[in-house]
């Protein structure tokens, strides 16, 4: 199941400010000259991409589409950053790929580009690829990349080297007897892998660390965090085990959804997680809040062994979540669970004393899923058909037709521009009885787990046999019509595909002994 990344759009309403250090005087001066300088961003394409990745030990690549508004906004900042970094030692190279160009689409597929702009850091000839998670303005890009190009883990030689560990952020430190051996090698490997997410350090002096103990049994990995236990240790140096330890330890046991900007990084991590999510929403400013909080935290401890992440949200700060899930304030206090299959379970007007029992019913599989859906339209006569959550599977997967479906938001400017184009394409194809162009308001309806909707508009093309492809083609009516005509299945092709699919289980099912 793909991550339900629409959840992340809930956080766009938050005032998430990615702060960056002020530009140095020489960088500011260089920025003033940027407009007159030659383009510093490399233009890559299918023919030169591999050579460029192999040539540059460190390169940031932007996958963009010419029609993408966010890409257009990023372009001048990206170019300015490239010029500011052009003389950096070691070299920091910025490049771009038009992922909408037909010949470059295999590159976009290879590197799992699912939205625009997508930025990825390529290190060591492409052996290490990471998502870029830094700011989107020039000075912020520069400072972030300078940090990324240095060592993945810094040695802590003296107490003053460790003062940064108390800055209220998450830090990971490896404590060793010597900087060699399997444990140290594995630690550095993980630091390189996760360097875009966390700061790593290493030392042979445990007493240099805050709350340190010179007698600590080494080697170990110590994670510093500004919540819960404040310090947690692990002695398992298997890379996979270490990664799981860091992931589990770097988010509060209960994430708080309020207006405090210090909580925003944890919210992003929470909503990006694949794990089931339990969310209690209520008014933080009313009297019962403390009793609910106490009961909820008690439930979290009781179910601590379960694979679920917990959140408590203030109604005032959580309006995006309410709108996304089709909830109303008069339903609060409420608990909402979204599981790994995108199914949702709702308990409205919950009482503090009911929280544990309701969660137990969820874990025991006794609850009925809740689905947000607009009513199925009584009349649906326009060229572009309106689809809702309650009938999307019937229209898209069970209609035996070729369906181009748009996931849109009513407030989205790009969606508004696309609407008349889809109308024109649908009108052109009205005589094609095996073709449907449809749309669904993804803010008013739950998006099925089969679709990965990261932004608006998102379009998918689904054939009668069930083949599902993210549409990344042109945005004119003619281009859409041409794409559908070239890629649609005939009744015969769909039947053949269905027959082949039906035969697969029999061909692959292992022989079983029957008693």
UniProtKB/Swiss-Prot annotation:
A motif (Prevents secretion from ER) lies at residues 512-515. The keyword Hydrolase does not apply. Disulfide bonds join 68-71, 412-415. Residues 494-509 have a biased composition (Low complexity). Residues 26-150, 346-489 form the Thioredoxin domain. Its main location: endoplasmic reticulum. The record marks 475 as: Lowers pKa of C-terminal Cys of second active site. The record marks 69-70, 413-414 as: Contributes to redox potential value. It is found in: Endoplasmic reticulum lumen. Glycans are attached at residue 283. It is an enzyme of class 5 (isomerase). Keywords: Disulfide bond, Endoplasmic reticulum, Glycoprotein, Isomerase, Redox-active center, Repeat, Signal. It comes from the Eukaryota. Pfam families: Thioredoxin, Thioredoxin_6. One of its GO terms (cellular component) is endoplasmic reticulum. Its EC number is 5.3.4.1. The keyword Disulfide bond applies. Residues 494-515 are annotated as: Disordered. InterPro entries: PDI_thioredoxin-like_dom, Prot_disulphide_isomerase, Thioredoxin-like_sf, Thioredoxin_CS, Thioredoxin_domain. The record marks 136 as: Lowers pKa of C-terminal Cys of first active site. GO terms for molecular function: protein disulfide isomerase activity. Belongs to the protein disulfide isomerase family. Participates in the folding of proteins containing disulfide bonds, may be involved in glycosylation, prolyl hydroxylation and triglyceride transfer. This is Protein disulfide-isomerase. It comes from Triticum aestivum (Wheat). The gene is PDI.
């Amino acid at each position: 199941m793909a991550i339900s990344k629409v959840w992340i759009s809930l956080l766009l309403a938050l005032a998430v400010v990615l702060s960056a250090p002020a530009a140095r005087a020489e960088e500011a001066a260089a920025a003033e000259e940027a407009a007159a300088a030659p383009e510093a961003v490399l233009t890559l394409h299918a023919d030169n991409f591999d050579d460029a990745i192999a040539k540059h030990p460190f390169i940031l690549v932007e996958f963009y589409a010419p029609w993408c508004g966010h890409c257009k906004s990023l372009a001048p900042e990206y170019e300015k950053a490239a010029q500011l970094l052009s003389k950096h030692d070691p070299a920091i190279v910025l490049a771009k790929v038009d992922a909408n160009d037909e010949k470059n689409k295999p590159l976009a597929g290879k590197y799992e580009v699912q939205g625009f702009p997508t930025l990825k850091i390529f290190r060591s000839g492409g052996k290490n690829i990471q998502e870029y998670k830094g700011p989107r303005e020039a000075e912020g890009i520069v400072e972030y990349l300078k940090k990324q190009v240095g060592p993945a883990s810094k040695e802590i030689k003296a107490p003053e080297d460790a003062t940064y560990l108390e800055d209220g952020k998450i830090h990971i430190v490896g404590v060793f007897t010597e900087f060699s051996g399997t444990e140290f090698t594995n630690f550095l490997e993980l630091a390189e892998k996760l360097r875009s997410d966390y700061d790593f350090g290493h030392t042979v002096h445990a007493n240099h660390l805050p709350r340190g103990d010179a007698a600590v049994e080494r080697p170990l990995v110590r994670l510093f965090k500004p919540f819960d236990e404040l310090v947690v240790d692990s002695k398992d140096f298997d890379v996979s085990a270490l990664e799981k330890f860091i992931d589990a330890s770097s988010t509060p046991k209960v994430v708080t959804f309020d207006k405090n900007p210090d909580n925003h990084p944890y919210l992003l991590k929470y909503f990006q997680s694949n794990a089931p999510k339990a969310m209690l929403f209520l008014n933080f400013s009313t009297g019962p809040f403390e009793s609910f909080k106490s009961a909820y935290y008690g439930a979290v401890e009781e179910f601590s062994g379960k694979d679920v992440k917990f959140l408590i949200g203030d109604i005032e700060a959580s309006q995006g979540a309410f709108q996304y899930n089709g909830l109303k304030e008069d339903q609060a206090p409420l608990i909402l669970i979204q599981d790994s299959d995108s199914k949702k379970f709702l308990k409205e007007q919950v009482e503090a004393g009911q929280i544990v029992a309701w969660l137990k019913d969820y874990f025991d599989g006794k609850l009925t899923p809740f689905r947000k859906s607009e009513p199925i339209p009584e009349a649906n006569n326009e060229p572009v058909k309106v689809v809702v959550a309650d009938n999307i599977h019937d229209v898209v997967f069970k209609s035996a037709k070729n369906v181009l479906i748009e996931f849109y938001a009513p407030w989205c400017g790009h969606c508004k521009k696309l609407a008349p184009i889809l109308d024109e394409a649908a009108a052109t194809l009205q005589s094609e009885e095996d073709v449907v162009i449809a749309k669904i308001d993804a803010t008013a309806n739950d998006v099925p787990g089969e679709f990965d909707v990261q932004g608006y508009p998102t379009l998918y093309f689904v054939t009668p046999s069930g083949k599902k492809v993210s549409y990344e083609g042109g945005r004119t009516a003619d281009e859409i019509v041409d794409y559908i005509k070239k890629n649609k299945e005939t009744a015969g092709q769909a039947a053949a595909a269905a027959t082949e699919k039906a035969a697969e289980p029999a061909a692959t099912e292992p022989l079983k002994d029957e008693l």
